[in-house]
């Protein structure tokens, strides 16, 4: 089993691209197959090396590896070879219209209530037409047999049928000699023996053309699966819609596995749950679980999943990362604060709160209560049982209810209104610092 992820390096990878990559990766790894990373850089004007590096960096950060990587630019001579064979077979023909002329034709056909399909006028040029186009460089179209039906059994959409008469002869090569997406893609899929192709539903019509080309070349047709596109604010995801790039999510300190857990489950019948490693996603993967329903993307959903993931991570999985951020903490500290952070970088704030230098927050109404609390603090360093004993003493001596004690005490000890359980927090702050904060208040 061989599948491929084929990004165009014309922009940074967004969540929609990454989802396709992940599903391709999971499909390959769940079947002990191979994943090809093909860089579709035939768009000479817009493709940039910085985007190639960005794509690779993002995939690596998301824990997705690949078995083979190649750029389409390195295979131009191969595309020329196959293109010339199609020319010799009469399957490709030159055309001379400008983009403006083609757009005018399209509008006229729509005005007449006809589908905007190329009229094949280039196949019936008169001598006068040829003189009119003299000096123009041709572009080339594939001649599709109009009496055929192109079909395949899509792994997500089921039976898909295209009547060739409703398909415009696709452009394979531009006037500058560069190739459009579908031709090099088809040649690569054949040459690298790709068996399974997973991509967005916006490629469904391309699939019909590629199957036709594969038939002309006598190639075996791979299996296809077309995923519904992610939508944000009613529009499909694209590189032109900002805020969804993977590098921005990395800068937000979101966990790679939170993103992967989200991408692997949206659009399926399975609940979106945080997974701490890729193995569990591989083991539960099934392409048949995906459906055709539209998918609305919300970054907030990943943020919420990120919180749930952090609450599951053991200390051993975060220790090195914390130390790399300059945070040296104990296992007990991590388990005390992990339920109170949105992203892992917030651990630093709790490390500072548990250290010296916190300024107590207190009003005059609670000053007497805090002084009493300091007098009642049990002797010795706080342990897991200190909080229960201390709270009971404060309640008995002050006559206050628990709810009237918690907030003043938390503000005095941490400077913030919410945080870890006191039973876990007190041993981290230590007796001397607790007394300093209460009496300093």
Curated annotation (Swiss-Prot):
InterPro entries tied to this protein: aa-tRNA-synth_I_cd-bd, aa-tRNA-synth_I_codon-bd_sub2, aa-tRNA-synth_I_CS, aa_tRNA-synth_I_cd-bd_sf, Glu-tRNA-ligase_bac/mito, Glu/Gln-tRNA-synth, Glu/Gln-tRNA-synth_Ib_cat-dom, GluQ/Sye
Short motif 'HIGH' region, span: 7-17
Primary enzyme class: ligase
GO cellular component: cytoplasm
Keywords: Aminoacyl-tRNA synthetase, ATP-binding, Cytoplasm, Ligase, Nucleotide-binding, Protein biosynthesis
Binding residue positions for ATP: 239
Name of one Pfam family that matches: tRNA-synt_1c
Any one GO molecular-function label of the UniProt entry: tRNA binding
Subcellular location field: Cytoplasm
SUPFAM superfamilies the record matches: An anticodon-binding domain of class I aminoacyl-tRNA synthetases, Nucleotidylyl transferase
Gene3D superfamilies: 1.10.10.350, HUPs
Listed transmembrane segments: none
The protein's Enzyme Commission number: 6.1.1.17
GO terms of biological process kind: glutamyl-tRNA aminoacylation
PANTHER family according to UniProt: GLUTAMATE--TRNA LIGASE (PTHR43311), GLUTAMATE--TRNA LIGASE, MITOCHONDRIAL-RELATED (PTHR43311:SF2)
NCBIfam families the record matches: gltX_bact
Function: Catalyzes the attachment of glutamate to tRNA(Glu) in a two-step reaction: glutamate is first activated by ATP to form Glu-AMP and then transferred to the acceptor end of tRNA(Glu).
Record-stated family: Belongs to the class-I aminoacyl-tRNA synthetase family. Glutamate--tRNA ligase type 1 subfamily.
Subunit structure: Monomer.
Record HAMAP family: Glu_tRNA_synth_type1
Protein name per its UniProtKB record: Glutamate--tRNA ligase 1
Biological source species: Anaplasma marginale (strain St. Maries)
């Amino acid at each position: 089993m061989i599948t491929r992820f084929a990004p165009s390096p014309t922009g940074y990878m967004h969540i929609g691209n990454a989802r396709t990559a992940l599903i391709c990766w999971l499909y390959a790894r769940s079947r002990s197959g191979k994943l090809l990373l093909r860089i579709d850089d035939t768009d000479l004007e817009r493709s940039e090396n910085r985007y190639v590096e960005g794509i690779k960096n993002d995939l690596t950060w998301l824990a997705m590896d690949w078995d083979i990587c190649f750029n389409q630019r390195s295979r131009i001579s191969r595309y020329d070879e196959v293109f010339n064979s199609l020319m010799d077979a009469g399957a490709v023909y030159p055309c001379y219209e400008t983009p403006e002329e083609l757009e005018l034709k399209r509008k006229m056909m729509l005005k007449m209530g006809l589908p905007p399909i190329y009229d094949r006028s280039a196949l019936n040029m008169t001598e006068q037409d040829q003189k009119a186009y003299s000096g123009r460089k041709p572009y080339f179209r594939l001649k599709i047999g109009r009496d055929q039906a192109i079909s395949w059994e899509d792994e997500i959409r089921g039976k898909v049928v295209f009547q060739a008469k409703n398909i415009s002869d696709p452009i394979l090569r531009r006037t500058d000699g560069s190739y459009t997406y579908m031709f090099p893609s088809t040649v690569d899929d054949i040459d690298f023996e790709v068996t399974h192709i997973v991509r967005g539903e916006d490629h469904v019509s391309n699939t019909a053309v590629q199957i036709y080309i594969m038939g002309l070349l006598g190639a075996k047709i791979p299996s296809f699966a077309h995923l519904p596109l992610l939508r944000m604010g009613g529009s499909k995801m694209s590189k032109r819609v900002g805020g969804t790039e993977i590098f921005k999510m990395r800068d937000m300190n979101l966990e790679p596995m939170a993103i992967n857990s989200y991408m692997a489950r949206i659009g399926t019948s399975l609940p979106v749950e945080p997974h701490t490693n890729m193995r569990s996603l591989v083991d539960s993967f099934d392409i048949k679980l995906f459906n055709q329903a539209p998918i609305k993307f919300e970054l907030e959903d990943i943020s919420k999943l990120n919180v749930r993931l952090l609450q599951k991570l053991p200390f051993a999985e975060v220790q090195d990362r914390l130390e790399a951020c300059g945070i040296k903490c104990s296992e007990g500290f991590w388990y005390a604060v992990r339920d109170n952070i949105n992203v892992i970088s917030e651990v630093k704030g709790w490390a500072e709160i548990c250290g010296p230098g916190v300024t107590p927050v207190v009003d005059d109404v609670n000053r007497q209560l805090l002084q009493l609390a300091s007098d009642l603090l049990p002797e010795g360093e706080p342990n897991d049982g200190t909080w229960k004993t201390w709270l009971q003493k404060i309640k008995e001596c002050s006559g206050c209810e628990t709810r009237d004690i918690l907030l003043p005490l938390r503000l005095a000890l941490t400077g913030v209104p919410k945080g870890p359980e006191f039973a876990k927090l007190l041993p981290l702050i230590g007796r001397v610092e607790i007394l300093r904060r209460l009496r300093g208040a």
